[in-house]
Amino acid sequence: MHKLNNVAVLYAKILFKQAIKLNIVSKVKQDLKALKQFCKFLAKQNMSLQFIALMKNKINLMDYLSSAYELDHLTYNFLKLLQKNNRLTYLSHIIIAFDAQVRNYQGVTLGYLITTIKWSKAAIKDIKAIFERKLNRKLIISNIVDKSIVGGIILRYDDYEYDLSMLGAINRFKSRIKLNY
């Protein structure tokens, strides 16, 4: 689960709208996937794209990325815009937000099922079917194990949360007591 910065979401929306207009969403998504791998490599080396851009000739770095990963012209110009506006540090969040835009466009929602133990594929499939009917769209669920919820489940998707956990019930009970006494 990611809490995204509003700046990253805004940049992702702009990139997505341009990719839709040019009918190159899948190519841009592929470019961003390659850039994500490059950023992971840099992170392992304790470096960031912003740091590399400041150390090297800025144009050479973007040209290197463009040729090494065969980036589309839109992706290349987008990277240059991020660099010009000192927003390269947002790239990983922009990639996540862009993926969310693509999923939304395709009618897919990403959700998280938080449980105290790992659920079976059959159980996840059952709850997925219920919420797909409710949402009227495809749902991709990741099962996250969190022992702190004590028991029950929490289902999160988009901006919604269904908290049916023991911890959630205890906290709701505490809130009611504080309000009434």
Curated annotation (Swiss-Prot):
Listed InterPro entries: ATP_synth_OSCP/delta_N_sf, ATPase_OSCP/dsu
Gene Ontology terms: cellular component: plasma membrane; proton-transporting ATP synthase complex
UniProt keyword annotations, A-Z: ATP synthesis, Cell inner membrane, Cell membrane, CF(1), Hydrogen ion transport, Ion transport, Membrane, Transport
Subcellular location: Cell inner membrane
Main location: membrane
PANTHER family: ATP SYNTHASE DELTA CHAIN
Name of the protein in its database record: ATP synthase subunit delta
Organism: Orientia tsutsugamushi (strain Ikeda)
